[in-house]
Amino acid sequence: MHRDFYIRLINREHPLPETFVPEHLIDIGLPFEAAPGDPKRLLECQAARAASQLFHACHRCGLNLWAVSGYRSFRRQQELFTGSPFVAKPGTSEHQSGLALDVSCPSIHMELSEKFSETGEGRWLKKNAPLYGFILRYPKNREEITGVPYEPWHI
């Protein structure tokens, strides 16, 4: 995969085509809310390796980080978009790239909510995600810039 792929901006102004599927998707093999075989357990291979390192470091700190959603196809995004006004339009979700991951923790029942930022896992992630090649992509008070509401669970 060309290295520019890893720095590509994906949003309303820079969508992915419907036919885009990452070349090297693998199961991240980490604590995951989804059952084995579910496509949302997949990430692009380099992102999966980085996520594995991030999760292991978090767990060594005594925290209980879980993955909730990784890769999402254009078609799956279309299904979710049809059912909710809060879901990104198909082609504009970073999940289609296989580089994005939603995370949560058992203390908030694996919810994807702002409450995650108040957990030990959320605070650890905010501080440490960049050490593993991830960022909190949709930070608080940056909605005008990102065009997306605050999502402390999305890396």
List each model region and its residues:
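Extracytoplasmic cell-surface/polysaccharide-interacting catalytic and binding patches
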Residues: M1-G70, F74-I155
